[in-house]
Amino acid sequence: MEKLTILLLVTAVLMSTQALMQSGIEKRQRAKIKFFSKRKTTAERWWEGECYDWLRQCSSPAQCCSGNCGAHCKAW
């Protein structure tokens, strides 16, 4: 009877550990999908007006679609 109780306890611990590990993996996978689905291409950012095309005045590289700012957005 003692062996059966110990076996059941060990089984319960192993199953709960597996469940915790599985939920952690699923959370990481969902986070990766969410991160990559938010990224837009340069063309999408330009089309939606989120960045400036070249020869437009800028104050930081993040404003330019090319990511290159020197008073005006540069093509490259």
Swiss-Prot record:
Highest taxon of the lineage: Eukaryota
Entry keyword set: Disulfide bond, Knottin, Neurotoxin, Secreted, Signal, Toxin
Propeptide: 20-45
GO cellular component: extracellular region
Signal sequence segment: 1-19
Cystine bridges: C51-C65, C58-C69, C64-C73
Expression sites (tissue/organ): Expressed by the venom duct.
InterPro entries: Conotoxin (IPR004214)
UniProt subcellular location: Secreted
MF (Gene Ontology): ion channel inhibitor activity; toxin activity
Bilayer-spanning residue ranges: none
Function: Probable neurotoxin.
Entry note about domains: The presence of a 'disulfide through disulfide knot' structurally defines this protein as a knottin. The cysteine framework is VI/VII (C-C-CC-C-C).
Similarity section: Belongs to the conotoxin O2 superfamily.
Protein name: Conotoxin Im6.9
